[in-house]
A protein has these predicted regions:
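Short hydrophobic/aromatic patch on the recognition helix
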Residues: 27-28, 32, 77-78, 82
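Residues within the alpha-helical elements of helix-turn-helix
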Residues: 20, 69-70, 85
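…primarily DNA-binding HTH/wHTH and HhH modules…
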Residues: 80-101
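An amphipathic alpha-helical interaction segment
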Residues: 1-2, 20, 25-29
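Terminal helix-turn-helix DNA-binding modules in bacterial transcription factors
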Residues: 2, 6, 11-15, 34-76, ...
């Protein structure tokens, strides 16, 4: 969990993470699921979306910049992942938060 929290914005590979932690990918997946309730990939995605939500609320950075900052090379993919996780696109999320604040 700590490793993912420090490296969530970097390119993700279960094998790469397992190598960095000197464990097998199977063991890493098992421990991550046990500790967080999510697979490593699910946890990375949730961590990225959570950080994006924070940046959308606390900064005026453009959505494309936020996408890059949380580890997405493709802003369209970020928009799709964010919408799937949150139920609305990032711009709408920001607008709704500011409106209800």
């Amino acid at each position: 969990k700590d490793y993912i929290d420090r490296h969530f914005a970097e390119e993700f590979s279960l094998q790469q993470m397992a190598d960095a932690l000197h464990v097998s990918p199977y063991y890493l997946a098992h421990v991550c699921k046990e500790a967080t309730g999510y697979s490593p990939l699910q946890y990375v995605l949730r961590r990225r979306i959570g950080e994006a939500q924070t940046l959308l609320i606390t900064t005026d950075l453009p959505v494309t910049r936020i996408a890059a900052q949380v580890g997405y090379d493709n802003p369209s993919h970020f928009n799709a992942q964010f919408s799937k996780a949150v139920g609305m696109p990032p711009r709408t999320f920001r607008r709704e938060y500011v409106y209800h604040k």
